[in-house]
Amino acid sequence: MKKLCLLGIFLAAFAALVMAGGQRAGGVVALRFFDVSPSPERQAFYTATFAKFRTETGIIVTYESTPWDDAANKLTALGVSNSLPDVMTFWEGWLGQFINAGWVLPLEKYISGTESTYTDTIRNKLWPKQKQLYGAIYTVPDGLMVKGIYVRKDWAQEKGLNLDPDRGWTYDEYFDAIRVLTDANQRHYGVSYRGARGGFDPLSVYLTGFAGGRFYDDRGNILLKTPEVYEAFEKWTNLYLNGYSPRDSINWGFVELVDNFTGGLTGTLLNDSEVAATCQATMRDDQWMVMPMPRSKDGKIYNTVNAPYSYSISTHSKNQDAAWQLIEFLNRSDNSIEYCKMGGLIPIKTDLTGDPTFGITGTYRAFVQQLNDPNMVIPTTYGPFNYTDMHQGMMHEEIQKYLLGQQDARTALDIILNELESRMKKYMVDNPSYQIEQPLANY
């Protein structure tokens, strides 16, 4: 009995050591890796890559995951309990919260000297933007995503729509195409409308186009309380109210958006380049195409450029050097190209930019063209403060109330904008040296 008790104590200690990202028996380094957007394909990739990593380095990596809808809460709980994994896939919208809590590690000392191996977009746009917001670089992208409009090519041809990715289009032309593609007799809806979490993100990009891509002036005042923006807000939400999307799309998130586009219920889908891989796998080439994001009234294309799930290292890791070694391995050319093609991402390393898949005639043509377009502008973010709770709730819930007739359009938008302004001004008081983020242009 005494031996069994001792064995139990040993096993418990062993498990605790592994969970802490410490050393296994014999001095073998063990890391925990956390995936916030699991799928069978992603898990298979990571499992195989971690096995290869162990063969080359001797370092053991344990794969952990949680569904996307639960990821923010799960990581927050792990942070509070000081048990975050060594390496995390990470949505950058959470950075404000995690940096304020001291849960993520600055990465400059690891990145230093390797900058030239990363593409111009990483070196000169994403990392400078992160440093401007948070004072340091905390993440390394797993790939790049640029938004575009997926269109049912076959529907468009039937309706006589002449869509040319090289010519592009305006928002009015985009909205008109949605109207034309809606056909009640065929049960065709013109748009996959995102009414649930994340729905405010593309809407906010559209709205900031009326303010030069900015949310705030230099004093932290919100710039979007104008008649023009309120009108644009109603024009966007009318896509739902006028019946151009199914009634239940008020509750649609990412999965429903994509499934209903590829399944033949909706004719357009505004989303990132990652969806291209799903379209390739489930649709014929003559059924779909990608248009660039529409031009705003000033002729600019306002579009986000980001990583779907950047890699970060937690401050709870006891093997931070090994954690960085894993991130470098994941972004090594042979592993990165496999990952990007699987996930529909644009590579972040310069030695992969010549792959024809990501060329101007490949599948990702419309996305790559936007990255190189002198008229594309990356708008500012919501701010450097913690807005995770808003993104999890208020940002879509207030709009849902309007769509359900529980409040008017201006009230819904003002509640969101007032809260953003309040948090920005408080942040500026607490951080007097902070300078308001500016949009990033390609020119």
Each language-model region and where it sits:
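Glycine-centered hinge/linker elements that transmit conformational signals in sensory
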Residues: 175-181, 219-250, 293
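Hinge/lid segment of periplasmic solute-binding proteins
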Residues: 92-148, 202, 208, 289-291, ...
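Extracytoplasmic "Venus flytrap"/periplasmic binding protein-like
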Residues: 48-122, 154-160, 259-260, 267-268, ...
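A structural signal for short loop-to-beta-strand junctions that line the ligand-binding cleft
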Residues: 77-78, 83-86, 115-155, 299-304, ...
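Long, aromatic- and glycine/proline-rich binding clefts that accommodate carbohydrate-like moieties
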Residues: 30, 121-124, 291-292, 341-401, ...
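Short, solvent-exposed loop/beta-turn-alpha elements that line the ligand-binding surface or hinge
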Residues: 108-123, 166-167, 190-193, 212-231, ...
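Extracytoplasmic/periplasmic solute-binding protein
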Residues: 132-142, 147, 157, 172-222, ...
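Extracytoplasmic/periplasmic substrate-recognition and gating elements
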Residues: 51, 56, 60, 81, ...
